[in-house]
Amino acid sequence: MRPSRRAPDEMRAVSLERGVVKYAEGSCLVKFGDTHVLVTATLEDRLPPWLKGQGRGWITAEYGMLPRATLERTRREASAGKQTGRTVEIQRLIGRSLRTAIDLEALGERQITVDCDVLQADGGTRTASITGAWVALADCIRWMKARNMIKTEVLRTNVAAVSCGIYNGTPVLDLDYAEDSEAETDANFVMTGDGRIIEVQGTAEKTPFSEAEFLALMALARKGVGRLVDLQKMAVA
């Protein structure tokens, strides 16, 4: 039995609310159960120096957690003077994932910066961030289209992410913190709207897992991502 009493293939309640920040070109408040992330997408007429003059744009991301997003207060990284390795890893993952969804040449020589701020953390902050970031990015693209800044289709596919793991010997979908902290195996799957794989991160925390168990996790992930993509489409409709 899962601590949440969910079925093995049951996700937490998920919501994606688009357009929640009036100043940002794109935004989304994403909730995976008790994990809440505010995502904004900012259009900028600048590029990394190495990309200038190449006729294409760029998508980059930043990720952070509010001090009381967790049970005990976490010191702000800005006050510590450096980002943790975990933060750097997650924001690079978000940026990589979103770039697969975009025709960077159609975007033109512009940069979209996606900021993911975790308001409350209960497991799966990176997967929630990626899923909500796609909605914020789509919201930003819509803003650009409304102002005739782009003429062709920029978004190529949906991108969503979900966690899976082996908990008490059973493959389960969308781990919350209680499950993640006790799981024998946990993995994050980032996929496109048609089920292609962008990235897989998987770790045996206690016992090595078999190929059959990995395939069971992937099957759960495909089901979860399919559900998330449906919710994304509803959010941007």
Swiss-Prot record:
Keyword tRNA-binding set for record: yes
Keywords: Nucleotidyltransferase, RNA-binding, rRNA processing, Transferase, tRNA processing, tRNA-binding
Record EC number: 2.7.7.56
Residues binding phosphate, per UniProt: R86, G124, T125, R126
Enzyme class: transferase
Pfam families: RNase_PH, RNase_PH_C
Catalytic reaction list: tRNA(n+1) + phosphate = tRNA(n) + a ribonucleoside 5'-diphosphate
Keyword rRNA processing assigned: yes
MF annotations from Gene Ontology: 3'-5'-RNA exonuclease activity; tRNA binding; tRNA nucleotidyltransferase activity
Entry-linked InterPro entries: ExoRNase_PH_dom1, ExoRNase_PH_dom2, ExoRNase_PH_dom2_sf, PNPase/RNase_PH_dom_sf, Ribosomal_Su5_D2-typ_SF, RNase_PH, RNase_PH_bac-type, RNase_PH_CS
CDD domains reported in the protein's UniProt record: RNase_PH_bact
Gene Ontology biological process terms from the UniProt entry: rRNA catabolic process; rRNA processing; tRNA processing
Membership in a protein family: Belongs to the RNase PH family.
Subunit structure: Homohexameric ring arranged as a trimer of dimers.
Functional summary from the UniProt entry: Phosphorolytic 3'-5' exoribonuclease that plays an important role in tRNA 3'-end maturation. Removes nucleotide residues following the 3'-CCA terminus of tRNAs; can also add nucleotides to the ends of RNA molecules by using nucleoside diphosphates as substrates, but this may not be physiologically important. Probably plays a role in initiation of 16S rRNA degradation (leading to ribosome degradation) during starvation.
Name this protein carries in UniProt: Ribonuclease PH
